[in-house]
Regions:
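Conserved alpha/beta-hydrolase catalytic His-Asp/Glu region
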Residues: 144-150, 156-214
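Catalytic active-site module of serine/aspartate enzymes centered on a nucleophile-bearing elbow/loop
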Residues: 243-275
Length: 275
């Protein structure tokens, strides 16, 4: 059996830690899995290229203050990959309809890593939908002098080593590497990420389109990020008209997992300032 056949025949596994059952909203024939908890201002998170299917402590902290919504994009978590899905353009249009069906007019949008790229693309297309924008260790802009690491060239151990500063935190959130179903699922998610980011690993037009985004914007960098150079968060903050840069100490590329309290405080400060 090939990997592709295995992916198609393997049910989505449920992680032993932090798993919660999702809700589903069918959008243009694609059932979008999402988790939602809390009340108040609507805050939507676009996830990165991993750690799906979980309601992690950071999500719980956010839900204590806002209406926190965490969808899983096509090919990730429990959202299937439609045959027609190919680009960030497809994702942006899908999410716009998703928000429409949930009755969300204006939102606070948060994007992490690959999801930061997606959030930036969404903001550039639909700036009037946003009350605020927060980008956490985002990717998607071109850095000529320091392009960073190509994640598709790394082995899984090399990738996880670069994602985290704190290896105890890494071990807490990693799925069982010996679980066959988990291995197949992670392969399928990496393939979904490749559809969006294989080549090029940036959008030359994005930094120009971001000039349309006038809402309060927070860019969160990580002082010890060994996956994405700090120049990336610097550049996002520079090109966004109302961009503000905060860089968290003591964390690698995954501040959601390594510094959830500090990250929550920074995000809520930006959200409350725009509400």
């Amino acid at each position: 059996m090939s990997y592709i056949d295995a992916v198609e025949k393997t049910e989505v596994p449920k992680p032993s830690k932090f798993y919660t059952e999702p809700l589903f909203e069918e959008v243009t024939g694609c059932p979008i899995a999402y988790r939602r908890k809390g009340s108040g201002e609507a805050v939507v998170l676009f996830h990165g290229a991993g750690f799906t299917r979980m309601w992690i402590p950071f999500y719980e902290m956010m839900s204590e203050a806002v209406d926190f919504i965490a969808p899983e994009q096509p090919g990730f978590g429990e959202t299937p990959m439609p045959n027609w899905f190919r680009s960030f353009n497809d994702l942006v249009i899908l999410y716009d309809q998703f928000f429409e069906q949930l009755g969300l007019d204006k939102i606070h949008l948060v994007g992490f890593s690959m999801g930061g790229w997606a959030a930036a693309e969404f903001a550039s297309y639909f700036p009037r939908r946003l009350k605020s924008l927060s980008l956490i260790t985002p990717v998607g802009l071109r850095l000529e002098d320091n392009p960073g690491v190509d994640i598709f060239q790394l082995t899984p151990p090399e990738l996880f080593d670069r994602l985290f500063k704190d290896k105890e935190v890494m071990n807490e959130f990693l799925v069982d590497p010996d679980n066959f179903d988990e291995g197949i699922h992670l392969y399928s998610e990496f393939s979904a990420a490749a559809r969006l980011m294989w080549a090029p690993r940036y959008n030359l037009a994005l930094e120009h389109r971001l000039q349309r985004v006038e809402c309060p914007t927070l860019v969160v960098g990580a002082e010890e990020d060994r996956l994405i150079p700090n120049e990336m968060s610097d550049k996002f903050a520079e090109v966004l008209p109302n961009g503000k840069l905060v860089r968290l100490d003591g964390t690698g590329h995954e501040p959601l997992l390594e510094r959830p309290k500090e990250l929550t405080a920074a995000l809520l400060d930006n959200i409350k300032g725009a509400s």
